Amino acid sequence: MSTYEISSETLAIIPIENFCSRVVEKDNTIIVNKTPMQIIEDSCSFFGSSYFGRAKGTKGLIGVSHKAPIIIEESKEIIFFPTSSPRLYECCWISLKHINRYQKQESNALVLFNSGYSLAVDMSYGSFDNQVLRATRLESVLRFRKNI
């Protein structure tokens, strides 16, 4: 597949070989001929903004600019966060709303999604927990502002 827009069904976007991605949805896995960052950028554009605009919005809302969570689409509260610097090829993007729980697995984090899918993430539990907390803060501010 050469194009993909993130939806409320998307759980994670994982880089694989040849600058492609494995996109995990609730009931499906799709191989996309784009990097995770390209999919994030395309999805931001699809919903009327740009990645840089969304990143600037995150900084304005919660003051985070490094490994910042991104609001892909506001009305459905689709928020993704990176597992490393988004500039790095190995960066995965995780959907906040689909996480059931996460736990430490050796030196990494294991993410358990509501659908039953699990993903071992190449980052420490503490770093993953921090990313979830940042994304949750962003979600909270977004909900508050939507209800004003």
Mark where each language-model region is.
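Eukaryotic intrinsically disordered, low-complexity regulatory linkers and tails enriched in Ser/Thr/Pro
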Residues: 1-93, 100-148
